[in-house]
A protein has these predicted regions:
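A glycine-rich helix N-cap at a beta->alpha junction
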Residues: 83-91, 103, 174-197
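C-terminal helix-cap and adjacent tail motif
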Residues: 2-15, 28-29, 183-217
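Glycine-rich phosphate/pyrophosphate-binding beta-alpha loops
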Residues: 51-56
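N-terminal targeting/leader regions
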Residues: 1-36, 41-44, 48
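Conserved hydrophobic/aromatic beta-strand scaffold that supports enzyme active sites
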Residues: 22, 112-114, 184-186
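Generic beta-strand structural signal
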Residues: 109-111, 154, 181-183
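Glycine/small-residue-rich phosphate/adenosyl-binding loop
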Residues: 59-140
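Small-aliphatic-rich amphipathic alpha-helix that forms the alpha element of a beta-alpha
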Residues: 49-50, 113, 119-172
Length: 217
């Protein structure tokens, strides 16, 4: 059911606090249980991405639920190839830390969802893209973020797998040539929850202070 947006909403302090907790809650899940999502849950989450603001109302995001075992296996094979290549680029001490990280839940997650941007869409007639054509892909990034937050609010975990070759994934999934991969997502219920982020917990990187990210001119 669509929310009532007939008037400007008023959000109380409790809602704002809950929203901030959702933002702060680590979202990149790599360890999934085998429990399937409820019927219709994936479709509901994808439908909510329509509320993400696309440039020129282009709505360029395309979602592919990867159900075929052979296609999933091909994506996993490409991930393992790309991961081995990435691992080899680090010096020995850092490589050991990299190897110990769990960077994807491709084998465990009940749902694989590939998210593409349709670069050939005619919706919006190019509004807002002449100077910054990359805004089309950024619109899909916002759709992914909306999906991610909506999923976590429902207790569903999402992991974004970027260690793949986009051209290989597009070929494996047999999508139109104008579709460009933005995100390959693992989706399912988390096997475990943590209040800290996995990369910080395992010594890869700490959070940057917000004071260093805002400047004035």
């Amino acid at each position: 059911m669509s929310p009532d947006v007939s008037s400007s909403p008023s959000f109380d302090r409790a809602f704002c606090d809950d929203l901030e907790r959702l933002f702060a809650w680590p979202r990149d899940v790599r360890r999934f249980s085998s429990c399937p999502l409820p019927s219709g849950a994936l479709e509901q989450l994808v439908a909510l991405t329509a509320y993400a603001p696309p440039v020129g109302y282009s709505q360029p995001s395309r979602f592919v639920s990867v159900c075929d075992t052979a296609r999933r296996t091909a994506v996993i094979d490409d991930y393992e190839r790309a991961n081995a290549e990435a691992e080899a680029t680090y010096p020995n001490a850092r490589r050991a830390t990299y190897t110990a990280l769990k960077l994807a839940g491709l084998r465990e997650a009940p749902v694989h969802l590939a998210v593409f941007v349709d670069t050939a869409t005619t919706r919006g007639e190019g509004l807002g893209r002449r100077s910054m054509p990359e805004m089309l892909a950024y619109s899909t990034v916002l759709a992914v973020h909306t999906f991610w937050l909506a999923a976590r609010a429902r207790g569903i975990g999402v992991g974004w797998v970027s260690i793949v070759d986009p051209s290989v994934v597009a070929r494996v999934l047999d999508v139109p040539a104008a579709w460009s991969l933005v995100a390959y997502l693992c989706v399912g219920y988390p096997q475990e929850e943590h209040l800290d982020r996995e990369l910080s917990r395992n010594g890869w990187e700490d959070a940057e202070s917000a004071a260093t990210t805002l400047v004035e001119r």
